[in-house]
UniProtKB/Swiss-Prot annotation:
One cellular-component annotation, GO: cytosol
Pfam families named among the record's database cross-references: TIM
Name of the protein in its database record: Triosephosphate isomerase
Organism: Chlorobaculum tepidum (strain ATCC 49652 / DSM 12025 / NBRC 103806 / TLS) (Chlorobium tepidum)
HAMAP family, A to Z: TIM_B (MF_00147_B)
Superkingdom classification of source: Bacteria
A molecular-function term among this protein's GO annotations: triose-phosphate isomerase activity
High-level lineage: Bacteria, Pseudomonadati, Chlorobiota, Chlorobiia, Chlorobiales
Subcellular compartments: Cytoplasm
């Protein structure tokens, strides 16, 4: 269960929120793996306040080179040095707003895995694509092309986030989400075999709230969540975490 804070919170606000979540995780004894993804400037300070709790520090993006003339970018080795163990790649906002392609995402995935980071690979269709009936084609292409030349997926998580449900208040029904998650797992089975697919965790993201989390997480192929807006409130985020059992 990962909270993606996106471009929200100052360093001080991030530390306060992380502290509140860490205290709740420690007190509640949660059964699932929990991560939070603050902004880049807050990573190091947040790391200090969660390192005792078992919460994973996640980054929201990375570059596919280790160093160099890439103004405004952050490399995987810098993220690792800041305490990150996960990085979110291919989020729909990166694809839609910043023009990231499957090929670019693939370069980042390979770099992050090579540097020892775990990767949350985001996939999902737009409203237009869903209405045209090509959801399966779009999502499986994002999976296949995002994983070109990746031979080991033991440190991979895939997050299905229908673009039309992110930040809109709309949520895929549990049946819609399960259908796509099953497609993803079937494609991974085809690419990497049944054992790897069975061990793969597939998250759902897209307006997950305390009120709908339990029914989503009850689906057989939904293994967790990538939570946006609700993760900015410690109580709401923990209610979702607890819904995952």
């Amino acid at each position: 269960m990962v909270g993606n804070w996106k471009m929200n919170n100052t360093i001080a606000e991030s530390v306060d929120l992380a502290t509140a979540i860490a205290e709740k995780v420690g007190a509640d004894g949660v059964q699932c793996e929990v991560g939070i993804a603050p902004t880049f400037p807050a990573l190091y300070e947040v790391c200090k306040v969660i390192e005792w709790s078992g919460i994973r520090l996640c980054a929201q993006n990375c570059h596919y080179e280790s160093d160099g003339p890439f103004t405004g970018e952050v490399s995987t080795r810098m993220l690792a040095a800041a305490g990150c163990s996960y990085v979110i790649l291919g989020h729909s906002e990166r694809r839609q707003l910043f023009g990231e392609t499957n090929a670019t995402v693939n370069l980042k995935v390979k770099k992050a895995l090579a540097e020892g980071l775990s990767v949350i690979l985001c996939v999902g269709e737009t409203l237009d694509e869903r209405e045209r009936g090509v959801t399966g084609q779009i999502v499986t292409a994002q999976v296949v092309e995002g994983l070109i030349d990746v031979t080991d997926i033991s440190k991979l998580v895939i997050a299905y986030e229908p673009v039309w449900a992110i930040g809109t208040g709309k949520t895929a029904t549990k049946e819609q989400a399960q259908e796509v998650h099953a497609l993803i797992r079937a494609k991974v089975t085809e690419l990497y075999g049944q054992k790897a697919a069975d061990h793969l965790r597939i998250q759902y993201g897209g307006s997950v709230k305390p009120s709908n989390a339990a029914e989503l997480f009850a689906m057989p192929d939904i293994d967790g969540g990538l939570i946006g807006g609700a993760s900015l409130n410690a109580d709401d985020f923990m209610a979702i975490v607890e819904a995952a059992g």
